[in-house]
Amino acid sequence: MTSLRLLLVLLLCSPSLIAAGWKAGAAKVDITPRKPIWMAGYGGRTAPSDGVLHPLWAKALALEDAQGRRAVIIATDTLGMTASLYASLKTKLTKAHNLQPAQIMINASHTHTGPVLRGGLYDIYPLNAERIKRIEEYSARLETEILNVTGAALKNLAPTTLKHGIGISRFGVNRRENKPYGDIPKLIAANALKGPVDHDVPVLAVYDGLKLKAVVFGYACHSTTLSFQKFSGDFAGFTQIALEKSHPGAVALFSPGCGADINPLPRREVSLAERYGHMLAAAVEEVLLQKMDSLKPNLTTRLKTVPLEYGALPPDEALAAAAKNPNNYRGRWAARMIQLKTTGKLPKTYPYPLQCWRVGDLLWLSMGGEVVVDYSLQFKKSFGPRTWVTSYANDVMAYIPTFRVLQEGGYEGQSSMAVYG
């Protein structure tokens, strides 16, 4: 009888007879530049970086479902992946880790206190050959670090459970409809802020038993609290620090939402970045404390490139007039547009990446570029509350306005194209 019981236990515990579930693995690596380098996001800077507020990170979360299908979320403290880096990383990740482009989601926190990357918004920065060389060197290192951290996450794959929930945090303000910014504190006090916002905080929690192994969180807001010369992940960096401190051994990853027209306001003080970061961390912690929805171990990944047509350039006379001032970013942009037209190399369309994942019954949409908030609100209205919309994903090439924003004009729908080129 004892032998029979032992045989039954062995059979029942055999891996081939246990229902397969999720596997997940997480890893992170410090990507803070080791030398002074030009910083990304603002064209008005006059000097390179001069220190570190807190480290910049590249983090990876690898997922594998019950059928062995894999996907990897890569979160970086950068302004945004450029077309050059995205193309290179797709090729290298496929070769090194057998991951197809649809299985790879590369997020950028859109921090404006990170380094300029290869091919990123060169027109707005006063770059010379030496500065570009340092940018190229750093970008090569970044690629290597991303390859390595992805490999480490895949190596760490182990049985887990995945859960999803949604919190709320209210510091994001529609920057188009609440000006001047100096009036924001009064508007907040009077509950008189205007314009669409998305204050949802989507959370994906990865558990090893009762222990939190990794957590991905999102929020639709520009990472522009800070504008000085020290590296940081802005408010989202402080959120990750707080979460990882509260959950030793866990890896926290930020997946930004459609915050192209949303700012953290008021801003420009480290104390505010820290405050917003802790507000967001508190929202994530509240979700973790509640009953979350378990996600079934089914994973599908899709990626489609859509040819978006460019609008018309300004008239030749306007370009020529602007090009006379090479010390201004619009002048540098105009000169480059003239050269592209003259050589017949002016593109008519841009290959825009749209990505769709199903993680259990969670629909996860990721969009390239800086996407305005209307998109996430509409997608969640159309597809339901279990819809997660990520922006600044894979290739950040321009602002992505809606028809409303285009009609209204302004920076997001018009003049920003000269910034992105």
Predicted feature locations:
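Sec-dependent signal peptide recognition
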Residues: T2-V9
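N-terminal signal peptide c-region/cleavage motif recognized by signal peptidases
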Residues: S14-S16
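Conserved beta-alpha junction segments in alpha/beta enzyme cores
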Residues: A20-N107, T111-V251, G257-G259, R268-R275, ...
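A short acidic (Asp/Glu
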Residues: P264-P266
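Anionic-ligand-binding alpha/beta catalytic cores of soluble enzymes and soluble regulatory domains
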Residues: L280-A281
